[in-house]
Amino acid sequence: MKLIREEIESVKYLVETTKSGKKSLYIEGVFLQGNIKNRNGRMYPMETLRKEVSRYNESNVQSGRALGELGHPDGPTVNLDRVSHKIVSLKESGDNFIGKAKILSTPMGKIASALVEDGVKLGVSSRGIGSLKQTREGVNIVGDDFMLATAADIVADPSAPDAFVEGIMEGKEWVWDGGILREKYACLLYTSPSPRD
């Protein structure tokens, strides 16, 4: 399986105030898009996204475990020391999934909050693993084995996604090994010619 990352540019910032006066910062917008070729040359069939978002909502969002990071790590696991937000909802709307995430009071969440307060326009980027199948037209169709690591990481440069999010990490694959997700490196075996040759 390959690591797959996608960026979305348009997110809104919301500030909600509780009755006690405590303010919470949220980001909201399109987190995932289906049935359309994206700038990375990939297309997520809606049925694949629908199935995976349903699983992700049940296992992560509803249990308060749907976390995202500030920036994009190189692997499919969420690093707790880099967590900046918690995804609180992810709902289908046409060929999109609209998400909402609460910015947390973690060190990375505080950085994200400061960036927003200082007027920085941030984007979101999904991260997951799955297989890709290329069509004759050169579109990479994401397979039905796709699994979200997070529906949204917060990223700094959504205006240049092709430079920042190449999407597939060359030379690495992720495999299940006894219930643990492990990195598998591509390996080439070279042999020297035998003396008889």
Language-model segment annotations:
Residues 190-197:
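Conserved small/polar residues in nucleotide/adenosyl-binding loops
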Residues 33-40, 74-78, 107-110:
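Short, surface-exposed beta-strand/loop "edge" segments at domain boundaries and coil↔beta transitions
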Residues 31-56:
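N-terminal "first-domain core" detector
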Residues 43-44, 48, 78, 88, ...:
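Short coil/turn linker and secondary-structure boundary residues
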Residues 16-17, 47, 190:
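Intrinsically disordered/low-complexity terminal segments and short unstructured peptides
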Residues 43, 71, 156-159, 193:
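Selective for proline/serine-rich intrinsically disordered segments
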Residues 59-64:
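Short, well-structured hydrophobic secondary-structure segments
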Residues 3-7, 12-29, 65-69, 79, ...:
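Residue microenvironments linked to proteolytic maturation
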